[in-house]
Amino acid sequence: MSEYSLFTSESVSEGHPDKIADQISDAVLDAIIAQDKHARVAVETLVKTGVAIVAGEVTTSAWVDLEQIVRDVICDIGYTSSDVGFDGATCGVMNIIGKQSPDINQGVDRAKPEDQGAGDQGLMFGYASNETEVLMPAPITFSHQLVQRQAEARKSGLLPWLRPDAKSQVTCRYEGGKVVGIDAVVLSTQHNPEVSYSDLREGVMELIVKHVLPAELLSKDTQFHINPTGQFIIGGPVGDCGLTGRKIIVDSYGGMARHGGGAFSGKDPSKVDRSAAYAGRYVAKNIVAAGLAERCEIQVSYAIGVAQPTSISLNTFGTGKISDDKIIKLVREVFDLRPYAITTMLDLLHPMYQETAAYGHFGRAPQTKTVGDDTFTTFTWEKTDRADTLRAAAGL
């Protein structure tokens, strides 16, 4: 981080229209994968006033009640009345899902599972930094925490005048690659019309901002912009059209690391846009956890229908304890980055994805979860269970 003195990242709440779309896409994926672990799923969602449109390509033996899934997601987020601008119980739901192209399928499936080809060409990045306990950049971590707290305060009734749509933005100050302060905080939250601006600002500052952000990083010079337009009553899909895959920087590292451009939500693990990005995070986090570097960004690329990555590259930004070339060699020895191996290594064939679709795919704690008869661990790419192996192999 020494190249920056200030760095800013943003996040959005689960009620943001693009995040509604992401959550619907991943809820559909979860429902299918719960019944058919070998399904091929690529689901896109659009939400706008009074309607949700679900499209894409799915090949599966499962049957799911897509309309009910869509309605449940919208209502669970908090859009349950036309008063807030969107009602999951009464909105229109359009299903225009087709089957996956056999041309793609023949390039992915193999007689030997380990030879499974990548579902598409592409490049993916993984990143980790030791600036927070979760080995994520601080600006995106704080931004996620703000909108998570907004949802918590709304759903618990702590701030009953809050509505689902919200956005956050945090600017951190760095010295010598370390976070030394927070320069600016932006939090815009949808709200009921009857609340005064003074009450809203006080409630948000005391029960959201100060509850989340470390006091030692705030100062008299920190700028706080709470609903800077003064009013945010119209929000959600009424205010803006929502689309799956339009918040890829929020989903990843807040702009601190590069992004290959492929979105995550709605895609089963055969799509390397998702699974290889998760593997990249797993590799980078274990490198940092092992003490091989303070920061690490890894790039991996694939060709459609080919199992082995076409390239693996890595940058520790001058923070490595050993050379980047040596770390790449260790990565190739310790991690198998073929698509099937990633799916096996991270145990990805479970209905774990809706939870990833809001508040970031990275920096989240693995949890044990049970769906029906299936018990599994979520956010497996956040484990640091290969750090000791890397450290030993590096001779540290």
Curated annotation (Swiss-Prot):
The residues the record assigns to binding K(+) are 44
Q: Where is the signal peptide?
A: none
Residues that, per the record, bind ATP = 16, 165-167, 240, 246-247, 263, 267
Its UniProt pathway annotation is: Amino-acid biosynthesis; S-adenosyl-L-methionine biosynthesis; S-adenosyl-L-methionine from L-methionine: step 1/1
Q: How is the cofactor bound?
A: Binds 2 divalent ions per subunit. Binds 1 potassium ion per subunit.
Q: Where does Mg(2+) bind?
A: 18
| Pfam families (alphabetical) | S-AdoMet_synt_C, S-AdoMet_synt_M, S-AdoMet_synt_N
Where does this chain mainly localize? Answer: cytoplasm
Region named Flexible loop: 100-110
Keyword ATP-binding in record:
yes
Known partners and oligomeric status: Homotetramer; dimer of dimers.
Q: Give the family, as the similarity comment puts it.
A: Belongs to the AdoMet synthase family.
What name goes with this protein?
A: S-adenosylmethionine synthase
